[in-house]
Structure formats: structure tokens, C-alpha cells
Amino acid sequence: MQTSICSPSSSSSLAILKLNQNPLLGHTVSPRFPLKRRPASTTRARLSAHRESVLKDFQDRRALKIISGLQNLDRENVASVVTAADKGGATHVDIACDAELVKLATSLTTLPVCVSSVDPAQFLPAVEAGALMVEIGNYDSFYEAGIVFSADQILNLTKETRRLLPSVVLSVTVPHTLGLPDQVKLAELLEQEGADIIQTEGGKCSHPSKSGVLGLIEKAAPTLAAAYSVSRAVKIPVMCSSGLSSVTAPMAITAGAAGVGVGSAVNKLNDVVAMIAEVRSIADSLAPSAARLSRPDGAFLKM
């Protein structure tokens, strides 16, 4: 069995994102991060009050976050994804960082809403609109444009986000373009800077050589390996994302993840009923693993 899994590319072969020259953001981002207004005191109080509930499913190792996509501003599709997450048994929903989309999502579900961006300033209006969690991640659309993020850039984005939003639950994705040792090192630094959750990814360059179940396992191998390695280096929860299915989601929990993130398996479907069924299938697949690992004798599985 042969699997073609892309290895991290050198800086000479891939463009490195310059934060003040980002073609995918709607405005120029200053590399010095000019002073931005902080959220109102009522927003800070709300975030502090909700932290425990947002993190509970991660602590129970049963979190399931359904992702609509960082660049997905299609209200109809986002509404379908949010509805599927709500009705299918997910614990969180992740949408693009847009205040109006947050208002739409919170009108459809009581699940914690996470917003994704690579611009810390964009988080503020989304959080004030009702988002309870922010994510520096969902880099797929950038990779498609040949843009990758360095460890230093991710670390700086994390520092600035934590400065602007000291109370918000903060998840940060470790880029798969880094080698595993560098992913682990970055995760440790992110934990020191106040990240609450580390998310792993597998990228879109894993091409299974087999179909069916074998192919699903091959596709998930990179992010499963990252979740295994990172979860043993940090004390905060790890979320495993990219290329997961009902077959491989339980493997992520056994590997050490506290939850899984699922995007294209759901948001690429054309029918909300099919979306709900897919979310339910993944949620049901997680239940036995979460229950087993919550038992006192389940500790042996994480060695």
C-alpha cells in the first residue's frame, strides 16, 4: 500500500504570507497591529461567564465542531451547516468571521459559535455579535493560493488576539506545512501565550491510494499523527481536524485529541437532511470512545 502524503515544503517553493500583503483579506493588515478598541465590559463579562461551558465538551473529550469555512459567506449554506450541527449532535459550530453571520448562526442554534480568521482585528465585531470562541486557522483557502504561515506569524497572531480578547476561548491551528517536531514546538509556545485549544490539520495534499475504509484512514493519517504528537506535549485540549469521517473520528480521540473538527464532509453536501445525517453519524461514532476514555481505567489508552 502506497500513500502520497506531501511533506512540508521549503520557503523557496512556497510563498510565505506577509501579513501586510495578504491578497485574501479585504483590507491591508499592518504588521505592527495598530491599537484597536477592546470589547465592551458587558462583552468581556459574557465571555468570562461562558468559558466553562464552551470548554466543557473538550474536557469531556467529546467535542465535535462543524466548520462552514473561513471564506464561506454564503448565508444559505452557512445556515444549512449550522442547522446540521444543531440537529445532528455537534457541540460547536465554526463559521467565517463576520458579525452578520454570527447573528444568523445564533438565531439558529444555542451551540457555541466559533469564528475563524487570520486577522485579530476582525474578531472584535464578531465577538460583540455573539461569538464565544475564536479560531486562528482554517488555512485551506490560503494554501490553495500558495500561501503558507510561518511559526513566528502564527505566534504573533496569537499574541495579538490574546491582547485584544483576553477572556475569549482561543483555538489556534498548527500548520501541517511544519514538520511534526516543529508543530509540537509551536504548540508548546502557543500554550504559553494563552491559547486554550490547539487544532491540528492534515492539509489537502494527502492522496489515498485506496478507496473505501482504507482510503479514509490514509487520508486522516497526517492529522492523526499530529494530534498524537501534540497532545503528549501540551496540557490544553487538542482538536483534530482535516479529512476526518465517522471511521477516523474515534481514532482521533484514542490518539489523544479532545475533539474533532469536520468541514468538507458536511459543508460540501447539497442537502441539509444529508448534512444532518453526516453530523449524526460522526457524533454517534465519537460516543463510545468518549465514554471509554472518561472511565478511570481508560487512562491506559493515553500513554
Predicted regions span which residues?
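Short N-terminal leader segment in a subset of presequences, especially plant chloroplast
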Residues: P8-L17
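Alpha/beta enzyme core
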Residues: Q2-S7, N20-S41, R46-C240, L244-M303
